[in-house]
């Protein structure tokens, strides 16, 4: 029975995301209390740039892995890992040379170093997610636990320091990289015949890379624009907490997105997608109601009175979080199914709308204007993805909205299955 449960990819993704959410939330509490609003605003600003830079530097390699995996290419795993290693090594050399030649700003140097590490972490994580979900779930668990323990210790033992907080972020990524590297078959890693695949991978990854960049811009452009309008770091810190809490509502959609990514490496499991959308949408609705009932006092209790206003930001952003489940799950299907152009165009329009609305709303409404811009963008993107999915795959809208009675039977039975479709 235990072996059957551990072979079920829904269960593994569920357990992995549960611990990510649990340890991550504890880390978030202590990180915000450790830094306070001003340092947290500066910390979030730096990491937002890291996220965007790393999205560019990844070049979409891990995003096209399921597509190449479906082609039954011999040593596909080794080909992608070797390319990722070469890529990161080149970035490190270029960054070092530039740092030596030019008098690089400290923040710029930090962004470069952390971005290169983040690129390798992301490549390894998503490639291994397709290859071995069980091992990937274990590694994510270890990473989340280490990050949580180190953050709590920093809060208890150290004075507030931005450099320490950034170091914790780097250590988290280094832990996950070291765990992934233990699996690699090094003697079989670099072969001359792999080179012929590198250019096709980079070519096919270019559009997904642009799409990944648009994703990050859509998530992170608000904080960058708050910076550009000289909103003080304390307000940005308040906003960043509200954004982080709203992103926790995406944990359930991410569970199903991971499973969809794994299964679309073999086929297009429409019923799996429908089931995933129903469960995710129901969860978001319940979470919104529960959080609304708990009210602002919960934020004061957990994060301190200086972060009380983050509750308002969270509730606004949750309105957009519902529609983003359609992007997260359906978007993964589109990428794996070769619909990258449609995926890209939708995200591009969403990002442009986000930027325009931010320009109009931030000068008057500050962080509330940024949250409204995000909600409009999220809803627009999600609705278009849903409409195209219903059209392309001939799915009735009733099949994706809310859980059905039959879903509870499936949920009850899935722990008894190995890897059957739900």
Segments from the language model and where they lie:
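Membrane-water interface segments that mark the loop-to-transmembrane alpha-helix transition
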Residues: 9-20, 45-46, 50-106, 267-288
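Interfacial segments at transmembrane-helix termini and the short loops linking adjacent helices
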Residues: 37-40, 98-114, 233, 293-328, ...
């Amino acid at each position: 029975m235990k072996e059957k449960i551990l072979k079920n990819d829904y269960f593994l993704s569920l357990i992995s995301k549960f611990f990510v959410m649990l340890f991550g939330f504890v880390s978030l509490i202590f990180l915000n209390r450790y830094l306070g609003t001003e340092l947290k605003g500066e910390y979030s600003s730096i990491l937002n740039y890291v996220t965007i830079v790393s999205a560019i530097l990844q070049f979409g390699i891990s995003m096209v892995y399921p597509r190449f995996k479906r082609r039954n290419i011999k040593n596909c795993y080794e080909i992608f890992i070797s390319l990722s290693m070469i890529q990161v090594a080149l970035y490190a050399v270029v960054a070092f040379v530039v740092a030596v030649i030019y008098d690089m700003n400290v923040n710029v140097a930090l962004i470069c170093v952390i971005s290169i590490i983040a690129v390798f972490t992301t490549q390894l994580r998503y490639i291994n997610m397709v290859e071995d979900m069980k091992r990937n779930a274990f590694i994510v668990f270890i990473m989340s636990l280490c990050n949580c323990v180190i953050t709590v210790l920093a809060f208890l033992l150290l004075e507030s320091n931005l450099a320490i907080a950034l170091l914790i972020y780097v250590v988290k990524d280094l832990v996950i990289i070291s765990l992934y590297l233990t699996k690699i078959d090094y003697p079989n890693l670099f072969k001359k015949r792999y080179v012929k695949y590198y250019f096709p991978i980079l070519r096919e990854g270019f559009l997904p890379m642009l799409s990944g960049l648009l994703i990050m811009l859509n998530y992170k452009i608000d904080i960058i624009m708050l910076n550009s309008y000289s909103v003080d770091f304390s307000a940005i810190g308040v906003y960043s907490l509200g954004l982080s809490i709203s992103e926790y509502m995406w944990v359930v959609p991410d569970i199903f997105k991971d499973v969809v990514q794994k299964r679309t490496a073999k086929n297009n499991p429409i019923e799996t997608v429908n089931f995933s959308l129903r469960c995710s949408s129901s969860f978001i609705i319940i979470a919104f109601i529960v959080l609304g009932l708990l009210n602002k006092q919960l934020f004061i209790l957990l994060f301190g009175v200086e972060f009380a206003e983050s509750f308002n930001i969270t509730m606004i952003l949750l309105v957009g979080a519902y529609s983003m489940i359609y992007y997260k799950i359906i978007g993964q299907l589109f990428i794996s199914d070769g619909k990258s152009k449609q995926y890209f165009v939708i995200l591009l329009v969403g990002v442009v709308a986000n930027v325009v609305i931010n320009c109009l709303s931030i000068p008057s409404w500050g962080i509330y204007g940024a949250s409204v811009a995000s909600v409009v963008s999220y809803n627009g993107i999600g609705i278009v993805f849903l409409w195209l999915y219903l059209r392309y795959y001939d799915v009735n809208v009733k099949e994706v909205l809310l859980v059905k009675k039959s879903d509870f039977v499936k949920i009850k039975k899935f722990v008894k299955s190995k890897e059957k479709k739900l």
